[in-house]
């Protein structure tokens, strides 16, 4: 029996684990399908305090993980399929059913499952994921050396992906369906200063063109209404994230976009004993440092819950 099971191993879950372990509480992290979360696909993190020269996303995750391990956190590579709420000797406990058939019991649960990449949902896109369509430049950029690619999106992630890809490719074209970008001023300027980056603003992607692998993309010119074809070897989609909460339907209250609702400034969900931290409950900011902070809140909330309920 664990004092707490943490589902998800990004900065929120790992920070919660540090707080729980330092409080002497037995806890385990279920890594999930994307161990380490979004940071494992981030090349350089420049806005996490304590690293004046920046740090790679994977290294930051490894460092936080090592810190939690030092205090006694356990780790398990598995995926939670269901959470069962039961009574045991008059006390509420949770049974977590894993994809390997095992069951873990815990007094509390922290949900830090993060969010996964969104795709466009256009014609021929799904069929060509892995054949020229990708949502991870860090993972796949190397395969496009000396080729032409496009990045779809107008936020910081899109700018970062495009800049990273210029290390390998001949040319990156950023496509955005509006004529203005959502990215921060500094990221916009970095992209605009890069000679390998070109722009297609106010264009809507309509169809992926492929012949065994991606050859181009059809775009709607929003100003003229005409369809244009752009030849490309790779399509990198960077339009945001979808919270990983499908398996939680009926377990905790979720908003219409799939984000977990928490009470006030706490990590408490609609279900007593279940807490949420990180991007899975943050539809606005989605920053590593904020996820870590919310993980700390979850750890403290769990400690308080266990104490108040004599668990």
Q: What residue ranges belong to the model's regions?
A:
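Phosphate-coordination loops involved in phosphoryl transfer and adenosine-cofactor binding
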Residues: 1-3, 77, 145-147, 202, ...
């Amino acid at each position: 029996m664990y004092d707490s099971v943490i589902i998800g191993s990004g900065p929120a879950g790992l920070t919660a684990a540090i707080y729980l372990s330092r409080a002497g509480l037995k806890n385990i992290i279920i890594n999930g399908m994307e161990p380490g979360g979004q940071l494992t696909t981030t090349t350089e993190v420049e806005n996490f305090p304590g690293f004046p020269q920046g740090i790679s996303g994977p290294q930051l995750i490894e460092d936080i993980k090592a810190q939690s391990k030092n205090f006694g956190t356990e780790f398990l590579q598995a995926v939670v399929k269901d959470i069962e709420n039961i009574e045991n000797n008059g006390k509420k406990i949770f049974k977590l059913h894993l994809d390997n058939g095992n069951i873990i019991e815990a007094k509390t649960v922290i949900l830090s499952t993060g969010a996964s990449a969104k795709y466009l949902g256009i014609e021929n896109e799904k069929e060509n994921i892995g054949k020229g369509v990708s949502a991870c430049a860090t993972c796949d950029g190397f395969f496009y050396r000396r080729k032409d690619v496009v990045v779809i999106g107008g936020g910081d992630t899109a700018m970062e992906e495009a800049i990273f890809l210029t290390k390998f490719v001949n040319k990156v074209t950023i496509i955005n369906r509006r004529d203005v970008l959502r990215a921060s001023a500094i990221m916009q300027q970095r992209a605009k200063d890069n000679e390998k980056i070109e722009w297609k603003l106010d264009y809507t992607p309509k169809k992926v063109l492929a012949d065994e692998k991606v050859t181009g993309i059809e775009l709607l010119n929003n100003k003229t209404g005409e369809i244009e074809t752009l030849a490309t070897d790779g399509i990198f989609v960077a339009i945001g994230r979808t919270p990983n909460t499908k398996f939680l339907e009926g377990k905790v209250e979720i908003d219409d976009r799939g984000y977990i609702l928490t009470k006030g400034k706490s990590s408490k969900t609609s279900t007593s004993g279940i807490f949420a931290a990180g991007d899975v409950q943050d539809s606005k900011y989605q920053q590593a440092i904020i996820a870590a902070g919310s993980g700390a809140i979850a750890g403290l909330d769990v400690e308080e819950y266990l104490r108040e309920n004599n668990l």
